[in-house]
Amino acid sequence: VWTNHQTLGVDPDRLAVAGLSAGGNLAAAVALLARDRKGPRLCLQVPLYGELDCRLETPSSQEITDRKVWCRDNCRISWDKVLSPGHMPTQYESPALAKDLGGLPPLFSFIGQLDPGRDENLTYWSRLMAAGVPVECHVFPGCYHCFELSVPEAEVSKQAYELTYAALRRAFSKG
């Protein structure tokens, strides 16, 4: 899209990257890669409840074990699909490993309070803020991983969607 923005009729200053869960990992990784490669310039990154830390050492990754919802075991299986045994992951595979979060695009994100990735996301958001990156983040009480996809008609899901759309509208209207 960035390389062919003229052909596509796309404003190269209004590009965002977004993803859910493992896709949230990819969105954060693409933001890091775009920064490190000096392009494309992203106006927003939207890693929603991203799987950001392959170490699975946070309190929430230890305490969310109910197999009726996304839990620690699911996280481990997910990471095992991405990382080979003995492989030392990079920041592009596990964005929480990044030493430097400065110079990244603004972030919008949300997560459920009962998501095993809650604490790794909270830590990542805090590190972004400490690096001077604008961050808008929301933790939805009583909600689990992918809650807005599981129960899209719920008021909390509608609120999560509207907050996301509003963040994208704001990012795309700047310029």
Question: Predicted regions span which residues?
Answer:
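Alpha/beta-hydrolase superfamily serine-hydrolase fold, recognizing
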Residues: V1-G175
